[in-house]
Amino acid sequence: MHLRGNVIYNTWENFWKKAYKSSYFRAQYDETSERTDWSLSERQLFTQSNGRTLLGQDTMGRLHFLCTPHDKIYAVPSGGTDLGGQFKGYIGQYYQNDTALLLGKMKYDLELDNGLMISGANKQSWTTYYDDFLPVTATEHPELETRIFSFAPILEKEAVPASSIHPVPGPAGAFYCIEVKNISGCKMKGKLRLSFDQKFVNQFEHYGKYFDDYTVTPYKSEWDQKLLVLWHPEACAAIQLLDSVCEGQGDNPRIYVPFELKANESRTFTTVIALTPKREEIYSALGTLYQHTPLEWLNVTDDFWKERFGKITTDIRENQEAGEKYRDMQVRFILDNFNCLSFREDGSLLTNWQGAPSHSLSRLWGIDITPDVVSVMYAVPEVGKSAMFYLAERNRPRYSLYSDHSMFYYISLLVIAGKYLELTGDCLLYTSPSPRDTR
């Protein structure tokens, strides 16, 4: 492997056998969630983030969405007269930024040479988290077994630091993979097909309304050598199924990988996705994603969280199951709160979503940021510094009739600063004449 230091998992088989598999955060297809299909916060999604790109995988194994934030933070009209404009804020909602969101509902299907069509996942599939952070959808078919998973990688700690909170955030992109194992007892030949919707969203706040109604189509969809590039003035996505055959026009592509598997043989297929607000940023993201194989990136990301969480145990001897649930819940709370945070490449905070995902895209609500950041700091204390710099400039609205407006927001900087000092002992931040120099 092209990695320094110890490797946790040297093969995918080793990972599937040894990785921790949550028995409590798992789900099958939910008809209500699928039928309702309102804002993203209403849907049953398993989420993961590297601090830059947030993704959600659903129980049908689809990469339902992924998004990367815009760098521009702007004021929200909060507490004033409702003019009926496109967006407005409420008390404690002062600032937001746009986000480049691909609502692709990306999926895999298998077309066998005998004419049989098999979906990568179905309503009987189970989705859960492996090693607490990785969404995995597992499906058993009569002929084969599949595991579909997706993740946005954390950077290598040995890499040249690009941010003040290195190795967070990671690159603006993700991997969407499927492992196919032939259990038919004979040789299997066919094609693995990748398909997805070409839809972007960059601003949305309408709770209870159909999210898909607010999507926009790319201005241009075109092949760029091995990449399918989808471009809109507010978003750009570059998609590549590795080793694939690419046919058709950009707005109606046919993407597949021919394969042949012996009995009991398995193969992992990978789609690389870069997603950025601007076209000029795409190759930069791809340059990082191409550095390692998905298994190598998984090891890097897994090592980061294992190092940060350590080994967590509980002393609930009377009820072991309750102890295991409590352990899973504590880890899940921290990870979900981390998933709410979006950072620039330099490590500065852009927003704290009101959920991962939230019905209001990329909007920070003052009542949420304090518990979210305090929770995350127990594993990733560096984010506290980024949050403090954000709040020092934005813990008040651009304009209000009231001096405090939202007390939760107003004092959030003090609460986070106290917890940061307790967890890190970083006195330099409070004594330096130029605190930003301490980054």
Where are each of the predicted segments found?
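Terminal accessory carbohydrate-recognition/targeting modules of carbohydrate-active enzymes
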Residues: 1-327
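Glycine-centered secondary-structure boundary/capping sites
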Residues: 114-115, 425, 439
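Short capping loops/turns at secondary-structure boundaries
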Residues: 167-174, 406, 410, 432
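A very general structural signal that marks isolated residues within well-ordered alpha-helical segments
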Residues: 184, 277, 378, 390, ...
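Short, functionally important structural connectors and interaction interfaces within domains
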Residues: 251-253, 421, 434
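Substrate-binding groove/exosite segments of carbohydrate-active enzymes
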Residues: 301-424, 429
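Single conserved hydrophobic/aromatic residue that forms the stacking wall/gate
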Residues: 430-439
